[in-house]
A protein has these predicted regions:
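Conserved RNA-binding domains used in RNP assembly and mRNA/RNA metabolism
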Residues: 1-80
Length: 80
């Protein structure tokens, strides 16, 4: 899977995070893995704010799937 670095804005906090997104053909969605643990008890929505330059994909952090269109359109996403 080709990775795309993304900048994430968590809508319920002052925190920002960076992460990697990759298209998952089985689910027809984007698999996102964050650098941090900002998907907490209250974090239910995020905005894919932009792409960014980063180094290696994270080895830890939160992981979830979102619709592929969310990254293209940079729209708000409600987490499952």
């Amino acid at each position: 899977m080709r990775l795309q670095a993304v900048y994430l804005e968590w809508d319920d906090s002052e925190f920002h995070d960076t992460g990697w997104a990759a298209y998952d053909p089985r689910r027809k969605s984007m698999l996102v893995k964050t650098m941090g643990w900002l998907v907490g008890e209250n974090a239910r929505e995020l905005t894919i704010a932009s792409s960014c330059d980063m180094g290696e994909p994270p080895q830890w952090g939160a992981q979830f799937s979102i619709p592929k269109s969310a990254i293209r359109k940079r729209r708000r996403v409600t987490l499952p």
